[in-house]
Amino acid sequence: MNSKLSLSTKLSQSGKTQLAEYFATPPFKVITLPSYDDAWVNGLNAMQMSSSPGVLAGDVLEIDISLAKLTALSLNTQAFTRVQAMNEGESAMQTTHISRAENSRLFYLPHPLVLHKDSIFKQQTQIEMREQSELIYGEIVAIGRVLNDERFAFRQFSSHLKIYALQNDGKKRPLVSDCIQWLPSKMNLTALSQMENYSHQGSLTYLNLAKSNAEIKQQVQALQQQFTDEKALLIGISLLNECGLMVRVLGHRAETIQQLFEKIGKQLKVL
């Protein structure tokens, strides 16, 4: 099935973020939620939903999100995305494109992906940011239905994340390029520096084009100190080359990583 979700934001006369345009084909749907206590006081809180039991063979999913100047969007999803079993030669893919105007802010944390036996899933995410914009973006993936004894039983998983700063001359300046490529039949994914004995991996990327590298470095040091004694998760926090940081996590439960990213995201919103 070919499915598309497209949404954009606008600023109301009272300075609140609203949906400007919204289009979705099954199984996608988005609902806006009541305002809540958040550092982005004029932001919009929304939930991305799906009526499908998961990602099926042959699915081509397209997500397009555009934020207008001075708007802020916090977008979560309803539930885990399960990539269902597929026959040999079948696959599914998702492309996500996010464009950000000046002084816009986005928090986007989809629920974890669960890779079922024999599945192949490929996703590509491209994000474009303009001056003074802010991004908190997370991805979490499970290596299979671990409680069913499925560990690395999928055929392939790839995830490519590219983030650019759009300059006034129209050129793109690369900020982040991150790639995950898992082929269990050809790779020892339990080796040292790979997944080892962990079953879930998460990455959280934070970029703020209004902050200096010195300010971001202080945030990195504060987060590193905060999670020094964490036992349930293996956490690495790194300073990006420009205007941002990345948190990489290995764990045994998706909910633990999800809650960690929500906690960090809430902190980053107020810094």
List the predicted regions and their residue ranges:
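Short, structured patches in soluble enzyme cores that scaffold and shape functional sites
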Residues: L67-K69, T77-A79, R100-E102, P110-P112, ...
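N-terminal, charged/glycine-rich beta-strand/loop interface patches
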Residues: M1-E102, L106-P112, K117
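Internal, conserved structured core segments that host functional sites
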Residues: G89-A153
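Broad gene-expression machinery/nucleic-acid interaction feature
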Residues: N2-S6, G43, V60-E62, M93-T95, ...
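A short, polar/proline- and glycine-enriched secondary-structure boundary/capping micro-motif
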Residues: F28-T32, Q84-G89, D118-I120, V146-E150, ...
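Structural motif
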Residues: A72-S74, R105-L106, E134-L135, G202-S203, ...
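Solvent-exposed loop and beta-edge segments used for protein-protein assembly and interaction
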Residues: M1, A57, E90, K117-S119, ...
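A structural signal for small-residue-enriched, beta-sheet-centric alpha/beta enzyme cores
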Residues: V141, V146-K266, L271
